[in-house]
Structures are given as structure tokens and as C-alpha cells.
Amino acid sequence: MELETVLYRVEGNVGIVSLNRTKALNAMSKQIFVDLTTAFDAAEKDDTVRCVVVNAEGRAFCAGGDIPEMKGLDNPEAVFDFYNVAGIFMKKMINFVKPTITVAHGAIAGAGTSLLLAGDIALVSDDAMFMVAFGAVGLIPDCAGHWLLPRACGLNMAKELMMTQRAVKAPEMKEL
């Protein structure tokens, strides 16, 4: 399957979905959400796939939303369309019928944090660092971040991370 921003392959009984916008640190564009949905649809329909692993190519898991693309959304319909496509994928991943495992390395920011937490199991490398960076760009957590983060680390810690945009390194991540 050829996708523009995501690699998808099946190894044994595992569907492997890899973010592949390395020049943009795998920032979440509208196209990446479309491609993720397509890859998950393929994994869902393939009876040989028993679980799905989401990882990323390059030096970062995901730098968050594609801010230049988001700034270019110049009318309400375009904004709605972008977030609708994102929401369709996030809902699909959160409610996916097969187990999902996210495997992250390097920078994990904003929507990347939401993607990490949307999996049934999240694994991070020792070099991983995440930040709930929405406030730094004047947004509230999207991509279900406002719902996923409190479930992962508790309400008070989630509020702290959302309000301060404090970077959290892998060892502390495991404590949360």
C-alpha cells in the first residue's frame, strides 16, 4: 500500500504503521490523518493482522500538529475539515478492535502526545521526551489529548502538564 505520509506493512500478524514525514519531524498534517485512517482501515479488514504497532521514521516520533498548515486554514470550513479528519482517526484508534501499541522515540509533542496515549500500550525509548505543547501555540489539547492525558497520569498532573508545557523525559514518563 502506497501512502503519502505513512508507511504501512504487515510482518507476521502485526500491522506496522510508521509516520513518515521526517523533514517535518512527523508533524500531524491533514494528509497524515487521512493516511493513518487508511492504514488502520487496512489493518482492520486484514484478518491476519492481530495487532497494530504505531511508530515513526526519523529522529522524532511526532512534533505535534503541523502549525504552518494549521495557520493556513483561512476559513471556518477548512478548520472544521482539518479537525474533523483528525477526530475521525483519533476516534478510530482509541476504539480500534485490535490491540494497538505505540512505540515512540525522540520528541513527542502536542498531538504526538495524544497519538502516543491513544494506543492500548505505550512504549518509549530512553531518549524520548514529551511535552503537552498546545498552550505554547494558543490552543487547548486536541486530538483527544484533553481526554487521554488525565486518564494516563491523573487529573492534577494533567492540568500541570497542560498549563506549564513542561518537558518530561522518559524516566519521569514511566513514573507518571
Region spans (language model):
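Phosphate-coordinating loops and pocket residues in cytosolic domains that bind phosphorylated ligands
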Residues: 27-30, 63, 72, 136, ...
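Crotonase-fold acyl-CoA enzyme core
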Residues: 91-176
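Glycine- (often His-adjacent) and acidic-residue-rich active-site loop
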Residues: 55-92, 108
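Hydrophobic/aromatic residues within transmembrane alpha-helices
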Residues: 17, 54, 66, 115-117, ...
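Hydrophobic alpha-helical membrane-association signature
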Residues: 32-35, 82-85, 115
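Histidine-centered beta-alpha loop that forms part of the nucleotide-sugar donor binding/catalytic region
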Residues: 20, 65, 105
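Conserved CoA-thioester-binding segment of acyl-CoA-metabolizing enzymes
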Residues: 1-57, 91
